[in-house]
Amino acid sequence: YGNDVRTRAKARAAAGSDARMNGCELPVIINSGSGNQGITVSVPVITYAKELKATDEQLYRALALSNLTAIHQRTPIGRLSAYCGAVNAGAAAGAGIAYLSGGDYEAVIHTVVNALAIVSGIICDGAKASCAGKIAFAVEAGILGYNMYMQGQQFYGGDGIVKKGIEDTLKSVGRLGKDGMKGTNEEIIKIMLE
C-alpha cells in the first residue's frame, strides 16, 4: 500500500487498536468512553500534523476539533448501540485532518457529512481484532470525505440518510444508531451466543 501519510495514518490507528484488542495493557486516550475511538480520533490527526509540520497549537486545535466532533456525533446515539463508534471517530479524524490541511468550517462539516455518507451503518459486534480493520476503513472514509470536498464533490440531502445541513445529518445518523439498530443489537447478541 505504500508509505504515504494517508496509509500511515490508517495503519497506525489500526495497529493501536489491534494491539489493544489482543491484550496490550498500555494506557490510551479515550473518546466517548472507548479506547478504540480515542485512538481513531487522535492517531491519524497526529500523523498528519507531523507530516504537515504543524505547530503544537495547530495540533492541539485539530485534536480538540476531532475529539469534540466525535462526541457531538455520538451524543444522539447514546452509550450502547450496534452502531460502530469507529465510524464517528473516523469522520471526526477527517475533520481534524481537514483543519490541519487549511480547511475552513465548510470543509470540516462537508468532510464529516461525506465520511458518514460513505461508512454509516457499520455494526459493532464487540471489542475484538476486527475493530482494527473497521478503524482503518473509517479513517479512510474521513480522509476521502475531505478529498472529495476539496475536489468539488459532496453528498447532498436526500442521498440516503444524508440530510440538508450537518446538524440534520447528525440527527439522521443518531436516529439510525439509537432507534434503527435496536433489533440489530439483539440479533448480534443472539449470533454471538450461539
Predicted segment positions?
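Alpha-helical support elements that line or immediately flank enzyme active sites
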Residues: 38-54, 94-102
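Alpha-helix capping and helix-loop boundary segments enriched in small/acidic/polar residues
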Residues: 4, 32, 36, 57, ...
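Acidic-glycine-rich active-site phosphate/pyrophosphate-binding loop
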Residues: 4-23, 55-73, 112-121
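Accessory "access/gating" subregions that flank catalytic or transport cores
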Residues: 1-36, 180-194
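C-terminal structural cap/anchor segments
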Residues: 78-109
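Functionally critical mobile loop/hinge segments
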Residues: 1, 8, 99-194
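Conserved phosphate/anionic-ligand binding catalytic regions in large, soluble enzymes, centered on
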Residues: 26-42, 84-89
